[in-house]
Amino acid sequence: MPAEDDSLQRLRGRIAAIERAGNGTRAGRACLPLGVSAIDDHLPWGGLATGAVHEILDSDDSNRTKPTENKTKYAVRKRFAEGLGGPVTAFAAALAGQAQKARAAPVIWIAPRIPERESLYGPGLQEFGLDPADLIIVRIPSDSDFTRTALWAMEEALRAPAIGLVCAEIEEIDLTSSRRLQLAAETGGGLGLLLRPAPRNSLDENALPPTASVSRWRISALPGAPADAPWLPERLPGQPRWKAELLRVRGGRPKTWQLEWRNDGHDTDTGSRPGHDSGKTASGFTLVSPLRDRPVLPETARPTVSRGPHGKRQARTG
């Protein structure tokens, strides 16, 4: 019955979208499709709504116990000082790359300036379709005024129609500040991503502080499948994978997907790789099956080494 449940859920979503359009509340709102029908059909606008701010939480598997409030704040601030995790940064870069192409406009990325942290790596961003030439990085000193300055910079950028997307790494935000960002996005038609290092122990979405963001996501890393490219060694990690949890969305329902990023060649070196089709430029998200549904790869027999009659090493399998 799962197929019928998904069909019924998509039908309900379309009916709800028609009703909202009929009431004039959100008719004709533009969106940024993720390119995965299962996700785009589930979201009320057929993708991430523009003229809106979306919240993306960075999961933390190290915090499995329930700490006190002070320990929770310390853990979040320590992670913020060390930088957001790779999964949420890569996921946001992939969304920014899609917005960069779809809206033909530059992307602004706001982050704290910390000596121990490096800036975003251009060649790595290109792997997710984000062109560094159209990326404006705003690094703000990580002092007591960082949050206020970062929120001001994000608000001003969201009001600018010439900006395709605004990413901001912000540790904490209250409801009033998030409403200002949402109002700025609605005024300028901007698309904002709030990247936050929320502790992983906040499994209950209701326990997280409320914001005015249109949607709230939580991103965590998944084991990647072995690389299937002929020019790469076997058993090398393949494309990045994420567990994308939609914790809440206006006019919609929570849901979880497992995604993989497919990069079929937008970097300049792929044409020289053996077995690569230099004419392919497609890249984007794709759904993958949960780990429990994928067949287990057979374990390769390891050779054992023994000594021959003359002291020479002999390898055999079995």
Which positions does each model-derived feature cover?
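Generic beta-sheet signal
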Residues: 110, 193-197, 220
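Conserved P-loop NTPase nucleotide-binding/switch module
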Residues: 176-200, 210
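Detector for small/aliphatic-rich hydrophobic stretches
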Residues: 1-111, 120, 124-133, 248-252, ...
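C-terminal functional extensions of proteins
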Residues: 210, 214-318
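Conserved nucleotide-cofactor-binding alpha/beta core module
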Residues: 102-164, 176-178, 184-186
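Conserved nucleotide-binding/hydrolysis micro-motifs of P-loop NTPases
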Residues: 113-116, 172-174, 198-202, 250-251
